[in-house]
Structure formats: structure tokens, C-alpha cells
Amino acid sequence: MAKSLRFIQCGDLHLGSPFHNLSAIDERWQRIVGKAPVRAFQKIVQMAIDKRVHAVLITGDVYTSADHNLTAQLDYVRLLHKLAQNNIQVFAVLGNHDPLEAWKAKIPFPPNVHVFPTDAVERVPLVVDGEEVAAIYGQSYAKSEQRDNLAWKFNRAAGDRFSIGMLHTQVGSRDSTYAPCTLEDLKECGMDYWALGHIHKHEILCEKPYVVYAGNPQGLDCTETGPRGCYY
């Protein structure tokens, strides 16, 4: 029996993202800074291995643009395989920068990776040593604009030991094009933990239940400063 559930929440990786306002630094540093998002995800993967987590939750916007450049794809899949080699499951939702309609990647993911569908909320059991220790719920974006309140579709199943909801959303706005919802909408779903993406600043919106934005692990321009990473 698993004594405790261990997972990492991250998102908004923006692999392959071009950095802005780099013209003032030399080419060597431009190359170093350009690889920073990948290096940040590498550190998250290594932390997952070191902490022997059961799962990594990725809350959307793995990439920045619809083309998903080949280098970014290869980096991402290589690191997913590293998690697979360490028996770590990965659960992912797609966000506004990497919706299903824009996915052109042909590089297959390893079998430890589950990407949630776009047409409905799906419940997936998290099984550790043959025992269901949690249920993960999620729904991805089909298009870059998602005006529907997806939070209204989530509903905890009876008998869940621990329920986690995953969503790429803008909390606090009814007019957003990023799956707008309110904190009360999330609270009413019965989840024990909400893993949210889209906002680049890490923030815990609520503790009962936990409603958490992990933020992005690497700032993408001079306005995104301060400590960044993931939640464990």
C-alpha cells in the first residue's frame, strides 16, 4: 500500500519559446538563455526522479506556438522517456498555446504519458503498486480560444480516495477566452486539489481545497522575474 501520494505540478513550459529583448546581449548568452526553458524542465524531471514521485502533472502550454519546433519536440519527448524509465506517470492537459488542433507532432509519447481529451472531462485512476491512490480529472483545449467554462463539467466520483482536477484556465474572469471560471466554480466540483495552468505567476488561490497555479518554471522576458519552478 502506498503510504503517501507524491506528485509534482508544473506547466507553461513554453519549450522553444523565443525570448524578447535579447539584442543587448552577445550571441553566446542569447544561446544560453534560449535553452533556459528546456533546462528548467530538465531540473523538474530530475527532481521527480530524486523525490521518487508517483506522477508529474503538466497543466498546458508545453510549447509556445502552433508549429512546435522539432528541437522542442525532441527535448520534451526525451525527458518524458526519462520519467518513463523511472516508472513515473505523466498526466497532461493541452492549453491555448498547444491545443489539439495545433498538434503536428509525430513523435510518439512513451506509454507512461496520458493526455486528456478535448470533448469531455475524463477520469483516470492513478495506480501505485496495484492500488488506486487517486483519481486525476482533466480536459484539454481543442482550439486556442476556449470560451466555455470547463470547470462546470468536473464532478468528483463517489468513492475517490483523493481527487485531482487539471485545467488550463483563467480564474476570476467570466469574459476570458481561456476557459474562464471563478474560484467558487472550482470549489463546487468536489476536488481535493486543483492543478491549474495559464497564469505564469505561482499562486495558491485556496487551501480548502487546494487551488494552485504553479506558474512557469522559467521567466520568458524581463517582466517575469523572481523565484520560479514547480510544486511538489
Task: Please annotate each region the language model reported.
Residues 1-73:
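N-terminal active-site segment of His-dependent metallophosphoesterases
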Residues 55, 66-212, 216-229:
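His/Asp/Glu-rich metal-coordinating catalytic cores
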